[in-house]
Amino acid sequence: MPGLRHPSVLRAMTRAVADVSAARSALQVLGPRPDHELVDSSRAIVAATDAEAGGSRRVPEGDLEACRAVVRLEETHDAYEALLQEAEGRLEAVYRSAMEGKDLEEPDGRDESAAAAAGDDAAVQEEVIAVLRQAEEGKPVESVRLVDRQLRHLPEAFGRIQGLRVLDVSRNQLEVIPDAIGGLDHLEELRLASNALISLPDSIGLLLNLRILNVGSNRLRSLPDSISKCRSLIELDASYNGLAYLPTNIGYELVNLRKLWVHMNKLRSLPSSICEMRSLYLLDAHFNELCGLPSAIGKLSSLEILNLSSNFSDLKDLPASFGDLLNLRELDLSNNQIHALPDNFGRLDKLEKLNLEQNPLSMPPMEIVNKGVDAVKEYMLQRWLDILLEEERKSIAAAESPQAPTTPSAWLARSVSWVSDVSGSLVGYLSGENKTEKDAYLDQQY
């Protein structure tokens, strides 16, 4: 890289690398991040207990301290990940300067660059002002598209454009979206992709008519819980961010969601509520850090396209309910550590595309996998039928034959029971109970 000849670039890169290394080391020492649902429940318990201060405590002290420890660990992870993100951003900027052969300290060209930037800003501001003026004059403004304008700031006044249905400010330099955006009662489509957003405002949950939301390619580390209130959403794209988790209740609320893109993030798990998205048609979660899927994933009865590829060493198993995804047409499980497909995989009769590359599969055998999706379905279906037949055979055999004792204690219990029955019968006989006429005759003979 020619830029490394500049001392300022070299110094900045050295500092940035050191900071990145320190932040990563700290995160490694902290260990795995706690599960998001566990963090949510722990926070709720701590908050409820604090609210009852002075009253009777319903949570044992040991459990309460464990909840506080979970919350502290989560907050520590947040702090170090923020430091890591900031250091990586500096390193990326230094690397870009080195690739371009520039010195970070550019006194000669600074005035010209500033002047050019000022000119661009002025042009953008004029365009923004024109839109706002049109709205203030009472003229209908249903769609605003300010794409690739180097926009750094979105005025609060945008939240007062009544009747606005589409707002597209993709590929700009926005770091913040104003809270006032929650005032766009009629907004149906919001595109914020390819900006520099670190967070979204909680007021986004007020957009009750929002149908399409694209926040891909930003710097988001989480989505606000309020996003679950956007119940009209049918498409949500949050790909290419740094998401470590999704809101706990997202699936309970977004029941109309059809397409969900969360690939290229840092997700360790999907919330169990996602299984309630009965309208979900497409789920793309490739290139994350998923350790598994919710056990009830099979409840996604409308799912047709599922991409779970490239979760690498983390994804090893699929839940038993996977075979209930009866409408699945396309499935990508490549680049994982899956050893066996679920026994009921053969039930996926509508499956047309299947990618199992780069997995240590033993079931089905690789010679079957190499023959294609139809061969895999046929093999797994036959295996499933064999399993069902064997279970049925065992069930019939168990029903037709009495249960025999299989352990010494079982034999002893059965023997004692038999002796008790015999002795009871003998006592009854000798005491004269239940004697028939034939019994009396025998007594007379002796």
Swiss-Prot record:
Tagged with keyword Cell membrane: no
Record GO biological process: intracellular signal transduction
Entries under InterPro entries matching the protein: Leu-rich_rpt, Leu-rich_rpt_typical-subtyp, LRR_dom_sf, LRR_domain-containing
Extent of the LRR repeats: 138-160, 161-184, 185-207, 208-230, 232-254, 255-277, 279-300, 301-324, 325-347, 349-371
Tissues in which the UniProt entry reports expression: Widely expressed.
Region Disordered, annotated ranges: 101-121
UniProt motif (GVYW) ranges: 372-384
Coiled coil: 65-100
Gene ablation phenotype (knockout): No visible phenotype.
PROSITE patterns with a match to the protein in the record: LRR
Alphabetical keyword list: Coiled coil, Leucine-rich repeat, Repeat
Sequence similarity: Belongs to the SHOC2 family.
Functional summary from the UniProt entry: Leucine-rich repeat protein that likely mediates protein interactions, possibly in the context of signal transduction.
PANTHER family per record: LEUCINE-RICH REPEAT-CONTAINING PROTEIN, PTHR48051
Official protein name in the record: Plant intracellular Ras-group-related LRR protein 3
Protein source organism: Oryza sativa subsp. japonica
Lineage of source species: Eukaryota, Viridiplantae, Streptophyta, Embryophyta, Tracheophyta
